[in-house]
């Protein structure tokens, strides 16, 4: 009395005085369960990716906001720095003071430094505002997509 498995059916052999039970339904292949598991895992990875992208957009917006605040305060410090440059200009050697000209190299250097610094800071400020707007827009769109 041995039992032998058959590929599509499961037969249980019992002693001769007991009834023979057979299973007519086909068992579910294990590949289908694995495919379902793969689909679920891929969906979970996609959801995690969307949430991490949303978090990245929010962090980008916050860092742009901090940069905007810092860059807004910096141009206010340009005038005291320019004044300091002009005060340092008066400490030049006495031989140059005799032929003092408004357009001396020291004065021109102060103006060039102030102009280049103001231009750089204003460009950084505009770029930071643009980054902030894009990051907020991206975060809002991703948030609406996940909800």
From Swiss-Prot:
<dbReference type="GO" id="GO:0005886">
    <property type="term" value="C:plasma membrane"/>
</dbReference>
<dbReference type="InterPro" id="IPR007237">
    <property type="entry name" value="CD20-like"/>
</dbReference>
<comment type="similarity">
    <text>Belongs to the MS4A family.</text>
</comment>
<feature type="topological domain" description="Cytoplasmic">
    <location>
        <begin position="142"/>
        <end position="147"/>
    </location>
</feature>
<protein>
    <recommendedName>
        <fullName>Membrane-spanning 4-domains subfamily A member 6E</fullName>
    </recommendedName>
</protein>
<feature type="transmembrane region" description="Helical">
    <location>
        <begin position="121"/>
        <end position="141"/>
    </location>
</feature>
<dbReference type="GO" id="GO:0007166">
    <property type="term" value="P:cell surface receptor signaling pathway"/>
</dbReference>
<dbReference type="Pfam" id="PF04103">
    <property type="entry name" value="CD20"/>
</dbReference>
<keyword id="KW-0812">Transmembrane</keyword>
<keyword id="KW-0675">Receptor</keyword>
<keyword id="KW-0472">Membrane</keyword>
<comment type="function">
    <text>May be involved in signal transduction as a component of a multimeric receptor complex.</text>
</comment>
<feature type="topological domain" description="Cytoplasmic">
    <location>
        <begin position="1"/>
        <end position="52"/>
    </location>
</feature>
<feature type="topological domain" description="Extracellular">
    <location>
        <begin position="74"/>
        <end position="120"/>
    </location>
</feature>
<keyword id="KW-1133">Transmembrane helix</keyword>
<feature type="transmembrane region" description="Helical">
    <location>
        <begin position="53"/>
        <end position="73"/>
    </location>
</feature>
<dbReference type="GO" id="GO:0005802">
    <property type="term" value="C:trans-Golgi network"/>
</dbReference>
